[in-house]
């Protein structure tokens, strides 16, 4: 049955989030200060009656992706989402600078030659959508385009 211990409020389903072959459970860690379109999760695995931490993530249900964030960086960043431009911005809490941005576009609305996206790199293409990213190379939090390609997962 449902109890306080078994009820989860996370909209993200269980999955192998880190590629280790085991199914992890997402626990909702979203705060009221966070954009409503973005949720954050603490991923745990179950072993012999104990839940143990695996990793953290931000999820964007509207755009269909999960972004796995390194444990060391998770407490240092916050996520903002602009629903009009479909842009997720990860911000360094300490110096309030952008760490990186991810923009979601419908495939037919994207052109490599569009000057609006000249600073962005495609990190994923899925189900008619294109996901573009721009990293702040001068950020104290070291994340590059290749790292972002590894961090992003499809719902």
Per-segment meaning from a language model:
Residues 1-2, 52-58:
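Beta-propeller fold detector
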Residues 73, 133-155:
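Surface-exposed amphipathic alpha-helical segments
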Residues 17-29:
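Acidic/hydrophobic-patterned starts of short beta strands in beta-sheet-rich repeat architectures
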Residues 70-122:
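Secretory pathway targeting signatures of secreted, lumenal, and periplasmic proteins
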Residues 32-47:
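Structural motif
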Residues 55-77:
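N-terminal "mature-domain start" segment
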Residues 28-35, 93-95, 134-139:
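Short, flexible beta-strand-to-coil junctions
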Residues 3-13:
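Repeat-based blade/solenoid architectures
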């Amino acid at each position: 049955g449902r109890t306080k211990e078994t009820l989860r409020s996370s909209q993200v389903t269980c999955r192998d989030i880190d590629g280790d072959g085991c199914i992890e459970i997402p626990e909702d860690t979203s705060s009221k200060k966070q954009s409503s379109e973005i949720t954050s999760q603490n991923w745990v695995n179950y072993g012999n009656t104990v839940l143990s931490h695996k990793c953290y993530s931000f999820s964007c249900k509207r755009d269909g992706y999960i972004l796995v964030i390194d444990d060391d960086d998770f407490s240092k960043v916050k996520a903002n989402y602009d629903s009009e431009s479909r842009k997720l911005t990860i911000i360094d809490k300490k110096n309030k600078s952008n760490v990186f941005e991810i923009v979601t576009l419908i495939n037919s609305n994207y052109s490599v030659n569009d000057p609006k996206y000249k600073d962005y790199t495609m990190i994923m293409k899925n189900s008619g959508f294109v996901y573009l990213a721009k990293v702040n190379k001068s950020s104290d939090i070291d994340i590059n385009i290749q790292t972002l390609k590894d961090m992003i997962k499809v719902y």
